[in-house]
């Protein structure tokens, strides 16, 4: 599974941020740097993420912070914060693109797509998966009715575990 996730997440680089986004991130960082040390702690990070529409689970937050806190000091400065948020914003964007693509295969709007439709799309369109990669993904996401709940599928693809 890890190799498939790496392949699907291979663009780990940060999003190029515009001046306005950098200014917004700086403003948010300063807002949560209450003691004006130039650093924020993990508890302030969750609030900052929500402000930017980046919703994360606690374990994801722990992983994001651990990755950004390269000095293991328990706090991150603005450059680390900006890099981390940029990567997360890119991931969120990619997740949304994939969710929207899956919705086209869900005419009933019930959150499920047929395994055969997903298989065809992932092995014939765009950056094609191999049969082995496809089977690896389906093994964790297919239900008894030969359907895939696509929000769970997308979350699995983009999780860092």
Curated annotation (Swiss-Prot):
| UniProt keyword list | Motor protein, Myosin, Phosphoprotein, Repeat
**An example Gene Ontology biological process:** myosin II filament organization
Looking up InterPro entries in the UniProt record yields: EF-hand-dom_pair, EF_hand_dom, Myosin_RLC
Phosphoserine-modified residues are: 13-14
GO MF annotation: an example: ATPase regulator activity
Tell me which domain of life the UniProt entry assigns to the organism this sequence originates from.
Answer: Eukaryota
EF-hand domain mapped to chain residues? 20-55, 56-91, 93-128
UniProt GO cellular component terms: actomyosin; cytoplasm; myosin II complex
Q: What else is known?
A: The sequences of all three RMLC calcium-binding domains have diverged significantly from that of calmodulin. Therefore, it seems unlikely that these light chains bind calcium. It is potential that phosphorylation has taken over the role of calcium-binding in the regulation of Dictyostelium myosin. In D.discoideum, cAMP stimulation induces RMLC phosphorylation; this chain is phosphorylated on a serine residue.
Per UniProt, subunit arrangement is: Myosin is a hexamer of 2 heavy chains and 4 light chains (two regulatory light chains and two essential light chains).
Q: What is this protein called?
A: Myosin regulatory light chain
């Amino acid at each position: 599974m890890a190799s498939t996730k790496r392949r699907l997440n291979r663009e780990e680089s940060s999003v190029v941020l515009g001046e306005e986004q950098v200014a917004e991130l700086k403003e948010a960082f300063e807002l949560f740097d209450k003691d004006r040390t130039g650093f924020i702690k993990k508890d302030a990070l969750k609030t900052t993420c929500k402000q930017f529409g980046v919703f994360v689970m606690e374990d994801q937050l722990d992983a994001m912070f651990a990755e950004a806190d390269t000095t293991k000091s328990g706090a991150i400065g603005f450059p680390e914060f900006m890099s981390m948020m940029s990567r997360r914003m890119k991931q969120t964007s990619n997740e949304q693109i994939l969710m929207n693509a899956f919705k086209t295969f869900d005419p009933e709007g019930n959150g499920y797509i047929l395994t055969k439709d997903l298989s065809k799309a992932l092995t014939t369109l765009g950056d094609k998966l191999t049969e082995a990669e496809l089977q690896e993904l389906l093994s964790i996401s297919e239900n008894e009715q030969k359907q895939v709940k696509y929000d769970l599928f997308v979350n699995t693809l983009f999780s860092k575990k």
